[in-house]
Amino acid sequence: MSDVDNWEPVSDNEDSTDSVKQLGPPFEHASNNDNAGDTEAESLQEVPLNTETNDVRKNLVVITNQSAADEHPTEIKHDQSRTSSTSSFFSGMISSFKSNVPSPVSRSTTPTSPVSQPSIISHRREPSMGSKRRSSRRISNATIAEIGSPLQQVEKPDEVKTRLTPSQMKEDNYDHRRFVEERYMDTPYHYASEQRNKDFHETFKSVPKDDRLLDDFNCGLNRELLYQGKLYITETHLCFNSNVLGWIAKVLIAFEDVTFMEKTSAAGLFPSAISIETKMGKTLFNGFISRDAAFGLMKEVWSRTLLQKDMASENINTKAEKSGNGKEIDDAINSIDEENNDKDANDNDTNENDDENISTNETTPNSTSSSPDKEKEKAYKLRADSSYQYDGPIYHHSTSFPAEPMANNEFVLKELPFDCAPGILFEIMFNSEQNEFLLDFLRGQEGSQITTIPNFTSIDGSSMTLKREYSYEKALHFPAGPKSTTCYVAEVIKRKDPDTYYEVISSIRTPNVPSGGSFSTKTRYLIRWNDEITCLLRVSFWVEWTGSSWIKGMVENGCKNGQLEAAQLMERILSKFIKNNVEECQITISKEEEEQDDKEVKNKLKEVDLEQPREAVVTAPAIAEQQGLKVTMETWLFLYLIVVVLLLFNLFYIRSIAVSLHQLVKLQLVELKL
């Protein structure tokens, strides 16, 4: 042990030790019992103390315990700028505590503990008010977090819990200028505004008014040319419209006709295209700015449309099964009633005369055997208040068309089943006296100035081939050129047989449009029995060229788009007319008559097959000499005009280059002179 450890303070007065033990803290020991401390205290009273000295005195902490010294290992910081009195005060204080006497508290609590190390004095700065506030906040927050709220821990009962839909979970941040608050079913997609919906229906007049617009996207249609326009998405249709420099392209695709859709790349490089596939082919839209948003909306509407279609078919099948079971039950009840009536009648006859009873018993099997031969079937007939007349069959076996129109390069627009006989549908569409359907159909295509619709007349003296002609004005939406064109229509009835099929070909010529004198649009209408009580309408078209044209592809695409739009309009108008003029009825069918009808139909179909085949329609037939010469001269004149324009541009550029060279030469001469 060193000398420092054995060192103890020595005082002239013996009571000083006891006083030290009683006071305990070194301040009291130094101020009351130590002579040196008294001297220093007197010197302190003589030195004037300022406020800074008082603050330092308050912040002085003396640590005599070893554990406390370990916890606060700070050094003594001296301010060199203090006054002489302040420095002497510190030196006196330090010298008074060099004795390193352990505190009485430590001696009393741990008598056997080793002697403590020398005391350490630290200068601790008092925390500011800001730090105190922050620490108080942390303490209060920690206390609150530990306590918690009992209301947050209580779970809601099962009756209160509700399942939120994705649309409710998603923030409602739609554009109020472009959309309304109403949503499409339970999806997060909003309907378009009233003005946007109105503008859409003005562009696509064949789309039903109740088919509301959801949204539109800027894109391009990939055909022979790239048509830049807008793709409109409604509840049931995909509609594309383009009108650039007079070239119009319109496409209408029903979602129920879509078989496949996918996101693809344009030209194999840019992932900004969407491919739509139907039974008629594939359509490619590219150049989408927001392809994912457009594809998501298409997929959502397509899935909802297919779901509604499946549910409707299931409901129809369920109703058919119920009606079939009810019919079987009614037939069984009626047969039982008839048998009971026959038995009662036979019993009465037995009581009257035995001979008559024998004859009745002999004839009864014949009468009972004939009852199952007749059956009641559902059919469709014209209403009593209908303006149309039809006296043909309303119940028949299904038939077929004689040839496939696709072999003649025709494009099938629609195949539509209707709840009526083929003859009823033919009378509604091509009746000579009642033309309400035809007038509504033409006006729906923006037709006006319709001439009087004449009756069909015979062409070659036979009643099988009939023809009629009329014309009307159709509005055009070209930015330049004529605002309307005259359409000359010629309708020819090729076949009119209520037992097999109907065939009508409509030819339309529009000479006022570009290359209008070189082509005509042919539309074929075929109607046959789809089953015993319904019919099937097939609409197809092709373009018949009588001359050549350098815009042939554009003309055919324009005709196709117009025909597709007209087919949509025709389907809607026909459904309305059939609903207003046709009703359901019950008829009695005999098996013998049915078998006889089958034989007659087979014979007629054989006769149709033995007939000469129809003329194959060639899309680009040979050009007549005079017409070909005229077309060739027009083409050469057009080419000559282009060459002349190019030569003029060339001369202009040559002259401008010569003027520029002349000016450069002048500038060089001026520089040489200078």
From Swiss-Prot:
Residues modified to Phosphothreonine: T110, T143
Places the protein is found: Endoplasmic reticulum membrane
Residue stretches making up the GRAM domain: 198-264
Keyword rRNA processing set for record: no
Region (Disordered): 1-52, 65-151, 336-380
PROSITE patterns tied to this protein: VAST
Keywords: Endoplasmic reticulum, Membrane, Phosphoprotein, Transmembrane, Transmembrane helix
Residue numbers on the Cytoplasmic membrane side: 1-633
Record-level GO BP terms: intracellular sterol transport
Chain ranges on the Lumenal side, renumbered to this chain: 655-674
Membrane topology annotation: Single-pass membrane protein
Comp. bias intervals (Basic and acidic residues): 69-81
UniProt key word Membrane: yes
Phosphoserine: modified positions: S113, S140, S149
UniProt feature, compositional bias: Acidic residues: 336-357
GO molecular function: sterol binding; sterol transfer activity
GO CC entries: cortical endoplasmic reticulum; endoplasmic reticulum; endoplasmic reticulum membrane; endoplasmic reticulum-plasma membrane contact site; mitochondria-associated endoplasmic reticulum membrane contact site; mitochondrion; nucleus-vacuole junction; plasma membrane
Protein family (similarity comment): Belongs to the YSP2 family.
Role of this protein: May be involved in sterol transfer between intracellular membranes.
Domain statement: The VASt domain bind sterols.
Family matches, as PANTHER family: GRAM DOMAIN CONTAINING 1B, ISOFORM E
UniProt-recorded name of the protein: Membrane-anchored lipid-binding protein LAM5
